[in-house]
Amino acid sequence: MGPKRRQLTFREKSRIIQEVEENPDLRKGEIARRFNIPPSTLSTILKNKRAILASERKYGVASTCRKTNKLSPYDKLEGLLIAWFQQIRAAGLPVKGIILKEKALRIAEELGMDDFTASNGWLDRFRRRHGVVSCSGVARARARNAAPRTPAAPASPAAVPSEGSGGSTTGWRAREEQPPSVAEGYASQDVFSATETSLWYDFLPDQAAGLCGGDGRPRQATQRLSVLLCANADGSEKLPPLVAGKSAKPRAGQAGLPCDYTANSKGGVTTQALAKYLKALDTRMAAESRRVLLLAGRLAAQSLDTSGLRHVQLAFFPPGTVHPLERGVVQQVKGHYRQAMLLKAMAALEGQDPSGLQLGLTEALHFVAAAWQAVEPSDIAACFREAGFGGGPNATITTSLKSEGEEEEEEEEEEEEEEGEGEEEEEEGEEEEEEGGEGEELGEEEEVEEEGDVDSDEEEEEDEESSSEGLEAEDWAQGVVEAGGSFGAYGAQEEAQCPTLHFLEGGEDSDSDSEEEDDEEEDDEDEDDDDDEEDGDEVPVPSFGEAMAYFAMVKRYLTSFPIDDRVQSHILHLEHDLVHVTRKNHARQAGVRGLGHQS
């Protein structure tokens, strides 16, 4: 059995050609065995020698991984991107994968490529096509970050003050299955939620996924910030972030900062910093003559003194509860922060300024404040609604908080109900199929009963049944008028032939046939018995107007969903084909019937 076939790179093919030229007396079969390739492959390589050497010179370093001359669908974009990448690397500056993707998106926007998304798959193929490889140090850092992490255990119930422990603090014990509805009676603009998150301010989120030039160094504790975010339920008020870190206060001083900053040895929000923050909030609410509720999560509340709070009531989430701001708001803030870092890094790379790649504490605080302001109030209100609170102006909270376990139980109950409904629908569908089968058998032996002879009970069942996607039979009947577009026009042209639309069941005939057609069928039965037998075997075919009206409803249903241009184009092509085929078949059917009557 010969060697297994494999696709060689241009660099490997070039080495084979070089080996043949350096050893002219060596048999070709021996060279093929030396490189573990079939003799036919060697012959093909030597035949295309000139093209292979030209491709190796063209791709340079990329020839070590490039195997074909097949161009990427974004060849022009990649050409500009690799030229930019080589220019930056020649200056000795590192280019990370996320920066490369952001630059590709900018180039695509300039070229008008709206379908380009700079996905991770494209980035991987781009690297292989152009020989951009990952460094070993970066790969090790990626492996560390990809390792599964054990989720942190929830805070001990003992750390949460119990109800009635003094001050304006309200606590919930872990043993309580249903937490009290402390937010009930408050307007949505008077219900605030605060949560604390960590931010590695001098690193991109995918630091380990950089390209050659990244050092993959471990993160330092001094580069981590703790950020406290606080907003109300309708998103109309976003309090300035409280940021804590290990580094001393910036030289600009607290007055020149866009948010409050505090430094301590642990780098977290301490009890003293939180008490000062709440005192300032209480003073502000007193000036506005408001009483608000603040729902807190992972805060330093073990020894928090709230006796001086008069206009702020503090309550704590029970263990295992997903806080409103952690349902997407925190992720948005980090995303906006990353975008600001990307813009700064790209400006430094294009200006070939290595010092611009470093981010100072003062600039990081400005980025945090800008990222917080970039969050839309509607997104904050949506997260509160998802957490079980009302959202929107002047809304009153009437629902209680739900833990993760309770939400999972509710989702399981809903899934069980949906499964039960699905089983009932399947049973009903099987019964309808059996009834339809019986109707077909009866249709072969005798005429189908008229609609007026149907029992009243069956009529009620048919009225109650709806189509598979919630479309009633009456909606289908109105398709000629309501669907719009070209199908509506075609259906209107045949409205006289199909005044009312009905579904065709089993062996039922179409009720839209006119009385003249019934008279013609009776005349055919009297004139020719053979024609009667043939007509009895014919499957009822909807008229042209009926077909157009049916598809008009299908089109209206499909276009009721958000669809892209490609799907819209498919629907338009299908419309054109259906009109053409239906007209052709309708004309052919009319001609066949005319010939039958003449005979």
UniProtKB/Swiss-Prot annotation:
N,N-dimethylglycine PTM positions: G2
Any one Gene Ontology cellular component term annotated for this protein: nucleoplasm
Keyword Ubl conjugation attributed: yes
HTH CENPB-type domain span: 65-136
UniProt region (Homodimerization), positions on chain: 536-599
Keyword Ubl conjugation among record annotations: yes
Domain HTH psq-type residues, every copy: 2-52
Comp. bias regions, Acidic residues: 405-475, 506-538
Locations listed in the record: Nucleus; Chromosome, Centromere
DNA-binding region: 28-48, 97-129
Composition bias type Low complexity, residue spans: 144-159
Modification type Phosphothreonine: residues: T396, T398
Subunit and partners: Antiparallel homodimer. Interacts with CENPT. Identified in a centromere complex containing histones H2A, H2B and H4, and at least CENPA, CENPB, CENPC, CENPT, CENPN, HJURP, SUPT16H, SSRP1 and RSF1.
Protein name in the entry: Major centromere autoantigen B
Protein's organism: Homo sapiens
Upper classification of the organism: Eukaryota, Metazoa, Chordata, Craniata, Vertebrata
